[in-house]
Design a protein with these regions (language model features):
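Generic protein-terminus/edge-of-domain signal
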Residues: 1-73, 95
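Low-complexity, intrinsically disordered short segments enriched for Gly/Pro and polybasic residues
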Residues: 41, 111-112
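Short acidic-glycine-tyrosine-enriched beta hairpin
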Residues: 70-84
Length: 124
């Protein structure tokens, strides 16, 4: 997939394809792609079956509403949220808000164990 930048009624998105799967990343995992979004409440993503990758969302500005396996979270500036692979989720800009965030899809190697350790520590 090629890099792209798209604007529309929903806001603006940028996508960067990467292949950081060699060298030191090979044994620990792979950053598959990353990007930046600055969106309004028209932007909404719903994945009832989740993804086949882990997804890290980093809020820079505004507010996002995120649902993970039926639990609701607010993504405020400075918030990092991990959406584990194969986990149902949805996210959108909060009503009346613009939401600017960075995202990163990663998978492979030791990333699943790291993700589980981070989530266990966060919720224990």
């Amino acid at each position: 997939m090629q890099d792209y930048s798209v604007s529309g009624d929903f806001g603006q998105v940028k996508f960067y394809n990467t292949s950081l799967s060699s060298g030191r990343f090979k044994s620990t995992g792979k950053i598959l792609c990353m990007g930046w979004h600055c969106v309004n409440p028209l932007y909404s993503i719903s994945r009832p079956n989740g993804l086949d990758t882990n997804l890290l969302l980093l809020t820079r500005r505004g507010k996002g509403d995120i649902a993970i396996s039926g639990k609701e979270f607010n993504a405020l500036p400075g918030t990092a949220i991990i959406l584990p692979r194969s986990t149902p989720h949805s996210y959108r800009a909060a009503q009346g808000c613009e939401w600017e965030f960075y995202w990163l899809h990663y998978n492979g190697g030791h990333t699943q164990a790291y993700t589980e350790d981070i989530l266990t520590a966060a919720y224990s």
